[in-house]
From Swiss-Prot:
One of its GO terms (cellular component) is plasma membrane. Belongs to the complex I subunit 4L family. It comes from Chloroflexus aurantiacus (strain ATCC 29366 / DSM 635 / J-10-fl). NDH-1 shuttles electrons from NADH, via FMN and iron-sulfur (Fe-S) centers, to quinones in the respiratory chain. The immediate electron acceptor for the enzyme in this species is believed to be ubiquinone. Couples the redox reaction to proton translocation (for every two electrons transferred, four hydrogen ions are translocated across the cytoplasmic membrane), and thus conserves the redox energy in a proton gradient. It comes from the Bacteria. The chain crosses the membrane at residues 4-24, 29-49, 60-80. NDH-1 is composed of 14 different subunits. Subunits NuoA, H, J, K, L, M, N constitute the membrane sector of the complex. Its EC number is 7.1.1.-. One of its GO terms (molecular function) is NADH:ubiquinone reductase (non-electrogenic) activity. This is NADH-quinone oxidoreductase subunit K. The gene is nuoK. Keywords: Cell membrane, Membrane, NAD, Quinone, Translocase, Transmembrane, Transmembrane helix, Transport, Ubiquinone. It is found in: Cell membrane.
Amino acid sequence: MVPTSYYVLLSAILFTIGVLGVLLRRNAIVVFMAVELMLNAANLALVAFARERLGVEAQVIVFFVITVAAAEVAVGLALLVSIFRTKRTADVDEVSTLKG
C-alpha cells in the first residue's frame, strides 16, 4: 500500500504548479486550468487524509466538492467564451476592466 505521505507530497506539488500557473500566466484559460488544478490537489489531499483517519465522510465531502467544481467549470467557461467574443482576447491584462 502506498503511504499517505506520498499522496500529500503529490498534492503539494500539484498545488504549487497551480499557484505558479495563476501567478505567472496571463492567458485566462490557463489561469482557469491552474485554479482547477489547485482544487483537485486539495481534493487529493483530503482523500489521502480520509483514507487514513476520517473515513467515508470526507470522501462524501470530496464528491460534493467535485460536483461544485463541475458547476464552476461550466460557469467559468461560459464567462471566458463571452469575454473572448466581446474583447477578442483571452489575456487577463486586457480584460481586467469590466466596462461594457
